[in-house]
Amino acid sequence: MNVLFAGGGTGGHLYPAVAMAGELQKRVPHVKLSFAGTEAGIEAREIPRLGYRLHLLSVRGLKRGRSLGALVDNLGVLADFIGAVRSALAIINSESPDVVVGTGGFVSAPLLLAAQMRGKKTLIQEQNAFPGVTTKLLSLFASEIHLSFEEAKPYIARKKEVYISGNPSRSFSAIDPDQARLRFGLAESLPTLLVFGGSRGARSINNAVLKWLDQITASANLIWQTGSLDYERIKAGVTSSARIWIGPYIENMGEAYAASELVVCRAGASTIAEVTNTAKPSVLVPYPHATGDHQRHNARALAENGAALLIDDEHLQAPESRQLVLDLLHDRTRRSAMSKAALLLAYPDATAALVDRIIRLAKS
């Protein structure tokens, strides 16, 4: 069996593909796996490190807006795309994959298109509640489309071979909450707030938490991943380390989720998958500049089902937002209801389910 994964740029597009590749290796002896990406994406570093073959394409996204500069730049983008499709056709010819799996990012469009032009089986895995342009267009010709949210269905023109499969994400071993808190050097008996904004951090979330710090630590623990860009600034602004674990990056997120009663975070697809799979009530702060405002759609999908609260980035530092977080942190009954709602939205077997479909397509 030969499977080619096309996706990347960010971890949100890459890691679902990596999870599926790992599952395929476990289940299919001698499976041949390769990836396609761009030199500027996270895949250029991660895929060779993981030992997979990587094909690099030159492709970039369209600039939004109607200015002359945007128009001129987009003509260059179109020329790059045509060149990328030619390169993708060469990759398809040389690799001869049984299935091409697209997980999003600029690179998935030329690879999926080239595969469809060559009559190859294609599977699209869409992570967000608001599908991207590539998914909307190429889903018309894909063998199968797999969505992570029921809310994404209305944006897909076709109705056959469309599945809700969830988003592949990291799996975490069961850990005792008290033991997990001890590993962060925190009191076992206090409710714990987990805050993070990705590996690089989220400045608006960090600024808000810095402002709320005294009120949080008066009656709760705090596990705070600041991100690499903000760590030194935030660390300098924290006058007491009592009841706080603070760091640029959390090595073991399973322990962090186990230790916490409530999570404050962005609403990227991978994060959504993790908070639902771990049944964590959350306060979601969508990144306001995400393409198509897709993080708001993700957050709304949880909020409307009772699994999360949604706070706009611009309102995060308001006193009402701080009080909302503190009240929820100490409201066990409400948190329990949100936890149950989150679990109903979870797809802990997403990776296995998607690999089942890849194997089926390859054999058909």
UniProtKB/Swiss-Prot annotation:
<dbReference type="GO" id="GO:0005975">
    <property type="term" value="P:carbohydrate metabolic process"/>
</dbReference>
<feature type="binding site">
    <location>
        <begin position="10"/>
        <end position="12"/>
    </location>
    <ligand>
        <name>UDP-N-acetyl-alpha-D-glucosamine</name>
    </ligand>
</feature>
<keyword id="KW-0997">Cell inner membrane</keyword>
<comment type="similarity">
    <text>Belongs to the glycosyltransferase 28 family. MurG subfamily.</text>
</comment>
<feature type="binding site">
    <location>
        <position position="295"/>
    </location>
    <ligand>
        <name>UDP-N-acetyl-alpha-D-glucosamine</name>
    </ligand>
</feature>
<keyword id="KW-0573">Peptidoglycan synthesis</keyword>
<dbReference type="GO" id="GO:0071555">
    <property type="term" value="P:cell wall organization"/>
</dbReference>
<keyword id="KW-0132">Cell division</keyword>
<dbReference type="InterPro" id="IPR004276">
    <property type="entry name" value="GlycoTrans_28_N"/>
</dbReference>
<keyword id="KW-0808">Transferase</keyword>
<keyword id="KW-0328">Glycosyltransferase</keyword>
<dbReference type="GO" id="GO:0008360">
    <property type="term" value="P:regulation of cell shape"/>
</dbReference>
<dbReference type="GO" id="GO:0051301">
    <property type="term" value="P:cell division"/>
</dbReference>
<dbReference type="GO" id="GO:0030259">
    <property type="term" value="P:lipid glycosylation"/>
</dbReference>
<dbReference type="GO" id="GO:0005886">
    <property type="term" value="C:plasma membrane"/>
</dbReference>
<keyword id="KW-1003">Cell membrane</keyword>
<dbReference type="InterPro" id="IPR007235">
    <property type="entry name" value="Glyco_trans_28_C"/>
</dbReference>
<dbReference type="GO" id="GO:0051991">
    <property type="term" value="F:UDP-N-acetyl-D-glucosamine:N-acetylmuramoyl-L-alanyl-D-glutamyl-meso-2,6-diaminopimelyl-D-alanyl-D-alanine-diphosphoundecaprenol 4-beta-N-acetylglucosaminlytransferase activity"/>
</dbReference>
<comment type="pathway">
    <text>Cell wall biogenesis; peptidoglycan biosynthesis.</text>
</comment>
<feature type="binding site">
    <location>
        <position position="199"/>
    </location>
    <ligand>
        <name>UDP-N-acetyl-alpha-D-glucosamine</name>
    </ligand>
</feature>
<dbReference type="GO" id="GO:0009252">
    <property type="term" value="P:peptidoglycan biosynthetic process"/>
</dbReference>
<keyword id="KW-0133">Cell shape</keyword>
<dbReference type="InterPro" id="IPR006009">
    <property type="entry name" value="GlcNAc_MurG"/>
</dbReference>
<comment type="function">
    <text>Cell wall formation. Catalyzes the transfer of a GlcNAc subunit on undecaprenyl-pyrophosphoryl-MurNAc-pentapeptide (lipid intermediate I) to form undecaprenyl-pyrophosphoryl-MurNAc-(pentapeptide)GlcNAc (lipid intermediate II).</text>
</comment>
<keyword id="KW-0961">Cell wall biogenesis/degradation</keyword>
<keyword id="KW-0472">Membrane</keyword>
<protein>
    <recommendedName>
        <fullName>UDP-N-acetylglucosamine--N-acetylmuramyl-(pentapeptide) pyrophosphoryl-undecaprenol N-acetylglucosamine transferase</fullName>
        <ecNumber>2.4.1.227</ecNumber>
    </recommendedName>
</protein>
<feature type="binding site">
    <location>
        <position position="170"/>
    </location>
    <ligand>
        <name>UDP-N-acetyl-alpha-D-glucosamine</name>
    </ligand>
</feature>
<dbReference type="GO" id="GO:0050511">
    <property type="term" value="F:undecaprenyldiphospho-muramoylpentapeptide beta-N-acetylglucosaminyltransferase activity"/>
</dbReference>
<dbReference type="Pfam" id="PF04101">
    <property type="entry name" value="Glyco_tran_28_C"/>
</dbReference>
<feature type="binding site">
    <location>
        <position position="250"/>
    </location>
    <ligand>
        <name>UDP-N-acetyl-alpha-D-glucosamine</name>
    </ligand>
</feature>
<keyword id="KW-0131">Cell cycle</keyword>
<feature type="binding site">
    <location>
        <position position="128"/>
    </location>
    <ligand>
        <name>UDP-N-acetyl-alpha-D-glucosamine</name>
    </ligand>
</feature>
<dbReference type="Pfam" id="PF03033">
    <property type="entry name" value="Glyco_transf_28"/>
</dbReference>
